[in-house]
Every structure is written in C-alpha cells, then in structure tokens.
C-alpha cells in the first residue's frame, strides 16, 4: 500500500481534490453513451416494426428466437419422431444416434448453429442440412479447425448474442484444450451444447493419448453444468431434448 501520506502527496501533484471513491460529474458526462445507445435502440425498433409489416412470419420467428423459446409444437413433433426412430432401435454408436437426432432437430430448429474442431466426420455433428458458414455465404455449420478453445469461446459469444443455440464437437480427451471457455459458459449460465465423442477409456486406435480418464469427473464437478452420457438411441434423444429445453446452464454431452 502507498500509505496515507504518499496518497495525499499524489492527490496534490495530480490536482485531484475529490474524496475517495468520488467520480466527478464531468467524467460521468464524458463516458455517458446513452444518447448513442438510444439511437441504436431506435434504429433496431424501427427495423423490427418494418419486418412485422412486411413479413409477419419472419418477425414472429425472430421474436421466438430472441425470447429463447422452442416452437409451439416442438414437444409433440419430437415425441412422434422419437416413436418412429425407436421402431428401428438398432444398436449403434451413440455419436451416430446423435446424428440421427440432429437430422430432425436441424430441420425444425433454425436457431441451431453446429460445428466441430476438425472432427465433423468422427463426431457426427454435421447433417444432411448442414450448410458451412464461409466468408461469402451464410449457413448453419462452422468448421472451426483444430482449435478447441477458440471453438468454445466462439460458441459462448454466439450464445451471449442471443437468438441462436450453438453446439459443436470434439473428442472428449481434447476437452482440456478448451476447458477455460467451458468453465466460463457454466459461470455465465449460458446456453451452449458441448458434444464430446469417443469417451471410453478403451476406445480408439490412437492409444492412451486419445483415451479420456479424468475428463468426465472434471466436467461433472463443474458447478452449473449439466452432463449427459447417453448409452442408447433413446438416451441420446432425451439428452438432446433436455439440453435444448434447459435455459440457464450449458450442457456437455458425450457420445
């Protein structure tokens, strides 16, 4: 600590006559951005009103997305879908089961933005209706490259923006590379779905470097995070549904 005498001398040298924790009105005025913010808000409200007039259907969709609500008939449609796929409940890897569920979800939820850290073919996070986002075209799927932390942090940003639900995958053992962003998602209580495949200690041909041991314990002990480890097509489908309807916590799924 500087000490009271040094602080007093510093105040005199800086010509700072204000008391402790006092902020002068001039500084408040210089930092006040309410006028600029009001302009942005007015512009946004005008665009929303224009959209409501010109395209009520899109305006209704926008309102639903920004309010983080699922479609009105989502529950009933999902139940029908579930009954149908369970008629052919063959034993398959849960990452493939996850892809089956995603095929339905992506066709019914335009707010889903998928991706993977260079493992789309292994995680099965892409679907027949996945359109890659590039610098020149819109889409609903991001090829993040080999950068797990960047991927997770970007998903956090997408979620914080609102209106979209991000999900993306990598191998469970690579969770460590993006761990801080996963923890931040839990800390902020935002809606992000982390998909981790190849979660068995004995799975894969790459040996112990790709076989997770402590990772499940780490994620399960993270406060404010749901962890689903599905073991069948039914459990995978239910895990996806509960991940989507839960608003205030990120979800981490293994497949």
Walk through the language-model features, giving the residues of each.
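Single conserved hydrophobic/aromatic residue that forms the stacking wall/gate
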Residues: 245-255
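Proline-rich low-complexity regions
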Residues: 24, 71, 75, 223, ...
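Short flexible/disordered coil segments
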Residues: 41-51, 176-187, 227-235
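Conserved acidic/glycine
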Residues: 1-147, 157
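Thiamine diphosphate
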Residues: 113, 120-216, 238
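Short alpha-helical segments and helix-capping/turn motifs at coil-helix boundaries
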Residues: 96-104, 177-181, 237-241
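Conserved thiamine diphosphate
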Residues: 1-34, 160-163, 187-243
């Amino acid at each position: 600590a500087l000490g009271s005498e040094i602080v007093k001398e510093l105040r005199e040298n800086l010509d700072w006559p204000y008391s402790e924790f006092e902020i002068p009105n001039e500084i408040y005025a210089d930092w006040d951005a309410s006028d600029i913010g009001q302009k942005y808000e007015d512009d946004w409200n005008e665009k929303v009103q224009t959209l409501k007039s010109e395209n009520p259907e899109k305006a209704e969709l926008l309102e639903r997305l920004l309010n983080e609500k699922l479609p009105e008939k989502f529950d009933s449609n999902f139940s029908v879908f579930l009954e149908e796929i369970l008629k052919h409940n063959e034993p398959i890897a849960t990452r493939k089961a996850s892809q089956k569920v995603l095929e339905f979800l992506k066709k019914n939820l335009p707010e889903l933005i998928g991706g993977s850290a260079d493992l789309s073919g292994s995680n099965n996070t892409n679907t027949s209706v996945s359109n890659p986002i590039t610098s020149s075209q819109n889409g609903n799927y991001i090829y993040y490259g080999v950068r797990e932390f960047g991927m997770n942090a970007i998903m956090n940003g997408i979620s914080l923006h609102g209106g979209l639900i991000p999900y993306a995958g990598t191998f469970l053992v690579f969770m460590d590379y993006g761990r801080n962003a996963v923890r931040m998602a839990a800390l902020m209580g935002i809606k992000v779905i982390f998909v981790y495949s190849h979660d068995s200690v004995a799975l894969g041909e790459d040996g112990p470097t790709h076989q997770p041991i402590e990772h499940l314990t780490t994620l399960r002990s993270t406060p404010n995070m749901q962890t689903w480890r599905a073991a069948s097509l039914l459990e995978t489908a239910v895990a996806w549904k509960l991940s989507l309807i839960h608003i205030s916590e990120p979800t981490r799924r293994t497949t």
